[in-house]
Amino acid sequence: QFSGDGTSSVYTLGEKEVDSVLWVKTDGVETEGWTADTQNGTVSFAQGSIPQKGLNNLEICWEKASTAKERIITKCTAGMNFGGNTDTRVFLYGNPDYPNYRFYSELANGLPSAEYFPETNYTVIGSSTLTDMVQQYDRQLIFTEDRAYYSYCELRTDALGNYYPSFPVYNLNFEKGNLIKGCAAVMDNTPVTLSDDGLNRWISTTVQDERNAVCFSAPISHTVKHILETGNAKNCCIYDRQSTGELYFSTPYGLYIYNYKANLWYRYDGIDAVQFCEIPGRLYWLNKEGKLYYFSEELTQDENGVITAYWCTPVSNFGAKGKKFDLLSVAVDTDNDNGTDLTVTANPNEIGQIMNSQTVSVDRNNSLLRRFFFKTEIKRVTAAKVIISSTHENRQADIKSITFKIKNKEVER
């Protein structure tokens, strides 16, 4: 669009060496009396056809096919919708030839378009590769491996006094960023990324402040440290499962789940997910071999075998405070639906051999609440753990409490 002044007969396009000028309109009506210089990118009007003075009253449409310029957009590997109250623009990044560039679309005839990317709609952000962009309310957070920026839609005024939307970029944090490409999550309206010190929640994204990212992964700090030391961050992914209030952190060493409603961590073995997707009622995950799986609470078999459910305590001294003790017995109280078998195993330590294992059965006809009790032979240890497992396909039990009896030189309890 151009604003005619009533006297100018030559208007310069935004590009040179265009393929053709398709049409020219004045006040919305297609007009004649013009010629195009496609080599120099200009349109000239004959006397009597010069556009009258007006605001955005002249429209010139031209085309220029450029495979190289198309690839600037089509080689981008990630993107998001953002801009205004209804996210009217597409923001793209991840072009390996332009690793620190952000490209964004423009409205076409006042409507959102995923096909119209003006040549000037880009931002160069720092000097490092962009790893992710996520939205928090009206802010767009932009990450590299060691820095964070933010952007938002800002109305600005041009030389003629016209308002136009702009998306400036501001510094947010010079120490922390996102190490996993394309895997930042938004947990309970708070962005989450993996940084050099662990998983971080971005609690304040309005101004630059080194305290706006807070690490919350201390309970799995040893695993995170090993991931960073071995360069395995690229093999991890983060996913927020809003329906259950859980954050999934998939690593080469297991799937760690943070229940942010209960502030608890737990781990699943044997899951090497590289991507998650939830369809209402079912969570799917893709492994690095391209196989698709889903989680189910109804299935009792997996790969033609009965699923073993188990729970284990942390390695603990059970209050012995570093002194050697004997683990005399373990008692497990369960609330049974239809009877079950439980195997209770006591280990002297996390990597030691099984010292004592006992399988006990409960018939529902006997009692709805039953205590499983067995003595152990673990003696003179400084730490131990207990594992409770069940391989029944159609029986279950809710564990209500576990009681340990220990003895050392000072006390028996």
Model features per residue range: what roles?
Residues 5-10, 53, 363-369:
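Solvent-exposed, conformationally flexible loop/turn segments
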Residues 10-13, 44-48, 368-377:
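Exposed aromatic-hydrophobic patches
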Residues 71-235, 264-270:
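Beta-propeller and closely related beta-pinwheel folds
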Residues 49-54, 377-381:
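Surface-exposed, short loops/turns at beta-strand junctions within beta-sandwich domains
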Residues 2-3, 31-38, 79-83, 132-133, ...:
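Short, exposed beta-strand/loop patches in secreted or surface proteins that constitute
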Residues 1-38, 45-47, 62-77:
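Extended beta-strand solenoid/passenger and fiber regions
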Residues 24, 55-62, 384-389:
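Short, well-structured beta-strand segments within conserved domains
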Residues 176-180, 186-190, 196-413:
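Beta-sheet repeat architectures centered on beta-propellers
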